[in-house]
A protein has these predicted regions:
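N-terminal interaction modules that seed assembly of large macromolecular complexes
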Residues: 1-32
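Aromatic-enriched hydrophobic runs in primary sequence
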Residues: 2-9, 60-67, 153
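A glycine-rich, acidic short-motif signal
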Residues: 20, 24-119
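Extended, charged low-complexity segments
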Residues: 124-210
């Protein structure tokens, strides 16, 4: 999960989107609720089950990538807590094809992001289907019980391409409060609190550069 989130956060940052803030919020949400599992839904479709009202994008994205064969039959994410992170995790895993997602923002408006091959477009309103017909051929629905509509593009492909080039040449300014949250939990995860966890725990004391 940490690898997927790290790569997704960097991917978002390259396009001027707040990857580190999204990752910090997703981590905080999961730490508060923790319970996430994959369950079979109707018609052989799979989706994450979470005690929290909103599904953890961290684990929804990880489940999608880990259970690659299942995604050919479909996967449903109901109201992800951080849809941008989920989108980036899926986009970086697929590496090709078309990916689209839509969600409700804090002002009750609809926001969306679309990836088609190497082109990236942000929508004011978008559709509720997240697809990649590439090598994996996955089909993921992302819904929030809304009536979705297609609307004009807010930021065109060239604008995002320029952002990406600027990020590579000039770097980006990170949100330090979000980074401190990630640093705190990284330290807790990488420093075992007992000999037993050091020998037998997840990662067994390995260092993850992400």
């Amino acid at each position: 999960v940490s690898d997927l989130v790290a790569v997704a956060s960097r991917w978002l940052r390259l396009y001027g989107l707040p990857g580190e803030t999204v990752a910090a919020r997703a981590l905080t949400n999961w730490l508060e609720h923790r319970s996430v599992a994959v369950q079979a839904l109707d018609n052989g479709v799979f989706g994450p089950k979470c005690e929290n009202r909103k599904a953890s994008a961290m684990f929804a994205g990880a489940a999608l990538v880990d259970h690659e064969p299942l995604t050919n039959r479909g996967m449903v994410i109901q109201s992800p807590d951080e849809p941008l992170l989920l989108l980036a995790m899926v986009a970086t895993a697929f590496e090709s094809g078309t990916t689209m997602i839509a969600w409700r923002d804090l002002d009750s408006g609809l926001q969306g992001l679309r990836i088609e091959d190497s082109r990236y477009t942000i929508f004011a309103r978008s559709i509720d289907r997240l697809q990649s017909p590439g090598q994996i051929g996955a089909n993921l629905s992302c819904t929030a019980d809304l009536d979705w509509e297609t609307a004009p593009v807010l930021i065109n492909d060239q604008t995002l391409s320029t952002r990406r080039e600027t990020a590579y040449s000039k770097g980006v300014e990170l949100d330090r409060s979000s980074i401190s949250i990630l640093d705190r939990w990284a330290a807790a995860a990488l420093v075992p609190d007992s000999e037993r966890s050091h020998d037998k725990g997840a990662g067994a004391g390995r260092i993850d550069s992400n």
